[in-house]
From Swiss-Prot:
GO terms for cellular component: plasma membrane. Pfam families: ABC_tran. This is Phosphate import ATP-binding protein PstB. It comes from the Archaea. The gene is pstB. Keywords: ATP-binding, Cell membrane, Membrane, Nucleotide-binding, Phosphate transport, Translocase, Transport. One of its GO terms (biological process) is phosphate ion transmembrane transport. The keyword Transport applies. Part of the ABC transporter complex PstSACB involved in phosphate import. Responsible for energy coupling to the transport system. Residues 11-252 form the ABC transporter domain. The complex is composed of two ATP-binding proteins (PstB), two transmembrane proteins (PstC and PstA) and a solute-binding protein (PstS). It catalyses: phosphate(out) + ATP + H2O = ADP + 2 phosphate(in) + H(+).
Length: 257
């Protein structure tokens, strides 16, 4: 399949192998992730989905020092391992499965803090960005009158939307999302899915999910991983209506999980 010209690809992953303690966790992964798209990575637990996600902004280096990477991962044509990790993570934001706001900071400061840490000091600009991001994730009307309250007082779903707002505050080019709705209620899950589809007009989104139905609802492109290997990838329509591999078909219809 053609995923667009190389200049349009956010990530170009070629023959990627990842070893932790000499054990192969990812094996021969080759994928292109186009810009301004939603790219879904699905597969059963232990298939390497979250590990692949953490490679894309080099968080894997924080989680485990005994790693070895073979192959290439290009970010807008540049080797990610030749890019300063802090700069890369500013441009490639991440939202985790477990909502992780700074619990002892206020709702406002959860977004303001990273802005200040990256050199934005003007209060008026910070206030503007905070409001913009809260509006974008649909939280503003729910929290505008208690911005100084601790983030820990929010519900789990609200906390997850706050962490998305925090990630968006730094204006990333890519947002990585690792099972972002698996631990929250259905109302907030639906709000986040709607947000994801809206955000692709601005940035690329890579979402990991063990839920094929969710991937089918939101993704433009899909990769199916199994036991650390890429089974196949293509457009969402191709993967869900005419998969080339029998294993993919079994996963999509729920015969393996």
């Amino acid at each position: 399949m053609e995923a667009g010209k190389s200049a349009e690809d956010v990530f170009n992953i070629s023959r990627l192998y990842l070893y932790i303690n000499d054990k192969a966790i990812l094996k021969d992964i080759t994928i292109k992730i186009p810009n301004n798209s939603i790219f879904g990575i699905m597969g059963p637990s232990g298939s390497g989905k979250s590990t692949l996600l953490k490679v894309l902004n080099r968080l894997i280096e924080i989680y485990d020092s005994k790693i070895k990477v073979d192959g290439k991962v290009l970010y807008f044509g540049k080797d990610i391992f030749q890019i300063d990790a802090i700069k890369l993570r500013k441009e490639v934001g991440m939202v985790f499965q477990q909502p992780n706001p700074f619990p002892h900071l206020s709702i406002y400061d959860n977004i303001a803090y990273p802005l200040k840490s990256h050199g934005i000091k003007e209060k008026r600009e910070i206030k503007k960005i905070v409001e913009e991001c809260l509006r974008k994730v649909g939280l503003w009307k729910e929290v505008y009158d208690r911005l100084n309250s601790p983030a820990s007082q929010l519900s789990g779903g609200q906390q997850q939307r706050l962490t998305i707002a925090r990630a968006l505050a730094l204006k990333p080019k890519v947002l990585l999302m690792d099972e972002p709705t698996s631990m929250i209620d259905i109302v907030n899950s639906q709000a986040i899915e709607k947000l994801i589809t809206e955000l692709k007009n601005e940035i690329a989104i890579v979402i990991v999910s063990h839920n094929p139905q969710q991937v089918a609802r939101v993704a433009d492109y899909v990769a199916f991983l199994y036991n650390g290997e890429l089974v196949e990838w293509g457009s969402s329509n191709e993967i869900f209506t005419s998969p080339k591999n029998e294993l993919t078909e079994k996963y999509v219809i729920g015969r393996i999980s």
